[in-house]
């Protein structure tokens, strides 16, 4: 006599949607919009019909996945949580690392799926720059440009380092980018009357 396995605990619609969204993101990066509901169901460990009970359609699921991945709020919270007591170099390295991970994730999804989902706005970019400036604020007197301008530079360099066709050649690591941001490519300028 065989024993029937116990039925899985019932999840709320939101929990089920979250579980499916967790499963679909890597599949979207790998297969783009051609990912099948069968692949999604297998990856999530659910029946195909469960997808349609949670999202009504594959298009709704893909849109929800893109919206979730492009939502800037979780990323903002990560940046806001950076310890202001860390030395400046460690804070900049942490910002570079978080930004590169975020940009790489967004680029991978956009490459695989296209421009589906919420558009990037200048308001979001400005909010991000202000947040980066806030993380830099404890070292305001050490900065050679204002904190918002410094935030723009960090974001710009992290963005450029995250675009595969811009970074032809060996990849930069976070330490190299941090040094470039903080010290440039020639270091500190020599004062005009300094002995050689």
Task: Tell what function each PLM region has.
Residues 1-43, 60:
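Basic, helix-initiating cap at the start of DNA-binding domains
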Residues 45-55:
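Short hydrophobic/aromatic patch on the recognition helix
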Residues 1-15, 74, 143, 190-196:
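N-terminal intrinsically disordered/low-complexity leader segments
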Residues 90, 101-111, 117-152, 163, ...:
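Amphipathic alpha-helical packing segments from all-alpha helical-bundle domains
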Residues 13, 17, 66, 121-129:
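Amphipathic, non-transmembrane alpha-helical scaffold segments
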Residues 29-35, 67-88:
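Short, flexible, glycine-rich and Lys/Arg-enriched loop motifs at helix boundaries
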């Amino acid at each position: 006599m065989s024993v029937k396995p116990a039925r899985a605990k019932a999840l709320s619609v939101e929990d089920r949607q979250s579980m499916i969204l967790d499963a679909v993101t890597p599949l979207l990066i790998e297969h783009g919009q051609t990912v099948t509901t069968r692949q999604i169901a297998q990856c999530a460990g659910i029946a195909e019909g469960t997808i349609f009970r949670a999202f009504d359609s594959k298009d709704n699921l893909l849109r929800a996945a893109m919206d979730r991945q492009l939502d800037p709020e979780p990323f903002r919270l990560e940046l806001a949580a950076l310890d202001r007591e860390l030395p400046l170099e460690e804070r900049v390295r942490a910002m570079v690392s978080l930004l590169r991970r975020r940009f790489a994730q967004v680029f991978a999804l956009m490459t695989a799926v296209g421009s589906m989902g919420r558009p990037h706005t200048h308001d979001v970019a400005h909010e991000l720059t202000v947040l980066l400036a806030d993380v830099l604020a404890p070292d305001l007197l050490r900065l050679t440009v204002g904190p918002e301008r410094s935030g723009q530079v960090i974001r710009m360099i992290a963005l450029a380092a995250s675009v595969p066709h811009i970074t032809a050649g060996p990849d930069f690591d976070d330490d190299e980018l941090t040094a470039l941001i903080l010290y440039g490519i020639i270091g500190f300028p020599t004062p005009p009357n300094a002995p050689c």
